[in-house]
Amino acid sequence: MVIKPKSYKQLAYEEIKENIIKGIYKPNQILNERSISEDFGFSRTPIREAFQRLYYEGWLVTRDNKKNVVREFNLEYILMNQKVRTSLEILAVSESICKFKESNIRDLEKITNEQEQIIKEGNFYNYIKLDRKFHEYIYLISENSVLTKILSNLNDTVRYFGQIALSYPNRQELTVQEHRRIIDAIKKRDEEKAIETMRIHMVNTTDAIEYSYK
């Protein structure tokens, strides 16, 4: 099977969105088409097409007659997003708990151990990737393709808002502790406990986001 190289439009889209998610492009920052095309070494056409897609997905807005403004998500929107995500995360752990094999549990433990090591190294972005990997592994084990697809569509906003939550003091360390409690409940095949520990984990994440917005 021949893998086609990504188009300039796709590369521009991915890079610009990643810069927004990582906070390189700040909320309310105006993105200059010419400047970005020069930075990327692309013509302005793929940059313009990438902007159009980012508008459609809600990452860019027009504000005060100024185009290509990085969207600033208000707290109300973030809390609605978290409410939906919490319900889905609980469903995922509920549907997966009886399907976990010992090897799967070891995989979750390995991810959590890697998170602890990353905290010591101070690699914030790799920590976030591992955090997503932990939750995505649970979705995978659930074998619920609809649930996995919905959560996959939320992935970028989850990463973006997760960075806000993890800026809360000691939140990274606390997240690892909460992940270990979830794993412990899965080991015991205690569905009620797994649901409750996941719910608490998500509530604490939401609280950290609210705190960071104050």
State where each predicted segment sits.
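Conserved amphipathic alpha-helical segments that form helical-bundle/coiled-coil interaction surfaces
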Residues: 81, 98, 102-163, 177-183, ...
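Short helix-capping and inter-helix turn/linker motifs at the boundaries of alpha-helical repeat units
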Residues: 7, 105-106, 170-173
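Short linear motifs at protein or domain termini
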Residues: 1-98, 140, 210-214
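Short alpha-helical transmembrane interface motifs in multi-pass membrane proteins
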Residues: 74-75, 161-165
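Short loop-to-helix capping motifs
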Residues: 33, 144-145, 189-190
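Residue-level signal for the nucleotide or nucleotide-sugar donor/cofactor binding architecture
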Residues: 42, 188-189
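C-terminal effector-binding regulatory domain of bacterial HTH transcription factors
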Residues: 1-5, 191-214
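Alpha-helix N-cap/N′ positions at the starts of helices
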Residues: 65, 88, 110, 174-177
